[in-house]
Amino acid sequence: ADFKLEHGEIEKAFSIYNEALQVIPNNPLIYNEMARYYLSDHEEEKAFNLYGKILADPSYKASYKIDILRKFSRLAKVENRIHAQTKKFMGIASKAHPYNPQLNNTFAEFLFEENSFVMSASYYKVVVDLRPNNYRAWQQLVLCYYNSNDYEKMIQSSEDALELFPTLPQMYFYNGMGLIQKKEYEKSIEVLEEGNDLVLSSDKGLKAQFLSSLGDAYHALKDHIRSDEYFDLSLEVEPENYYVLNNYAYYLSERNTSLEKAKKMSKLSNSLKPEEASFQDTYGWILYQLGEFDDALNWLKKSEINGGNNSGVINEHLGDLYQKLGNSKMAKTYWEKAFEIGDASDELKIKLNK
């Protein structure tokens, strides 16, 4: 039947396949050949029906099923209509082989790529429980928790991974980031400094991340001397890291110190990543602190247009600027909007009650 199918004798091939199915019913190998033909002939409903039977059959090797699922994953990237069916197939296969690490990993990767981080984490958790030495699965599990804002599990899973991989610095970084999110700054500094010592000098990207995260942690503790030192070190390693340039510049502007340095860094971050609302806000706020109000208004309005209208901080900055320009009505409008959004400063209520 396979020979005849390859040589275009479709009817004869399917006649033989059906005869074979009378002898060995529901044989997944036969179904697979038939399904492949249906898919190539654009008879998707027939193909999907057979693939569903194959993937649900526990007797069919998981490795063969993974090949099928990866084929559908590739198709799903170029054909949106295939995506839902692929996800359904993944679920069918994982139920048939709940303790197969490779199959669970395949489903976890698919879910991660579609940003279904909570569901992806559940499958990566199965993988690391079955194969604790799979470092990449640990990394992905931690990133799932980070992307779903589950910092408790992010911290716990990175700690579990560190027991298995104590010399690999990346997991120290994840653990430190989780601790920063939980506002456990002293502990995060301990972890980040330990991990930083393990980073190879050739890995500039990771080294810069460790140093800037230490800068963030010390900033949160209001240890500005150490914070500035770490940001400077980070920029020595990676001078054009626009996130570090922006964050460092903004922290300086908040403290109303080293504003010319902040202005230079912020200008560079905006040239490296144009149209970024938070970066434009930083530059506008630095100009505000320098008393360059007209230019500040130009940059803060750019920030508003590029998405900053949904930020309490940016609306509060616009309110502060309009107040400086003598337009109390506009100032109050922006302050009220900032209050509604809810991520503005603690002083906002005082401004509104004046």
Question: Where in this protein do the model-derived segments appear?
Answer:
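C-terminal interaction modules of eukaryotic adaptor/scaffold proteins
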Residues: K332
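Residues that scaffold, gate, or flank divalent-cation-dependent active/transport sites
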Residues: K329
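Alpha-solenoid helical repeat scaffolds
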Residues: A1-G326, E336-K354
